[in-house]
Amino acid sequence: MALQYEDKVPASYRSGFIKKVIDISEKLKINPSWLMAIMYFESARTFSPSKKNGIGCVGLIQFCPDKGKNYKTINGKQYLMSDISKMNYSEQLDLVYNYYKTYSGKLKSYTDTYFVTFFPLAIGKPDDWVIQGGGLTASQIYKSNPAFHQVKDGKIRVWEVKKKILENLPTEWLNEGTVSLAVKSYKNYIVVGTLSIIAGATLFYYNYGRNGSK
């Protein structure tokens, strides 16, 4: 079974990329298509580990530098942004896994997985919670993320992010319940076995400036 957007991965490293995404997703206990969707849109539809945005974030999930620094801290280790941008796909997928691994087994939807990528402090918060913290004010986050402007009052709430995401939900992901995906093994683009995952996931396009809160 093909993963979401796997045909968009550059052919030169597609097979190895997909295999590694599946391996990572099994460890994280998530649907590998969620991770594929995040990387596709975060990298501006390129799956390039060197893709940069306008405010210094780089890579497959747009790693953002720590505030005022030239490095990104992940699980206590500092990674120079210049080094992250030079990583090949395999090296950076290892970093992607390191970023998510503390949430292994806790991500029950695409929305959960996206909030880990976008603003972890928002995970588990009520829909009316104003997104802020981590050294960033609500106003700063608002200005950096116009895609989520619903009320347009200088702040972004959790429900505004969800609403934007749901606007781009593909019809095949609308069904709730347990979905069976073939992810046990991957050989010559043939995946066999099953992984039980929670559906009701979402896709959306997001390629605005990031707030650096990851």
Sequence positions of predicted segments:
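Single-pass alpha-helical membrane anchors
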Residues: V183-S213
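Active-site or metal-binding loop neighborhoods of secreted/extracellular toxin and effector enzymes
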Residues: L136-K187
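Catalytic glycan-binding domains that act on GlcNAc-containing polysaccharides
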Residues: A2-H149, D153, V161
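Intrinsically disordered, highly charged
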Residues: M1-D23, K27-K29, E167-S185, Y208-K214
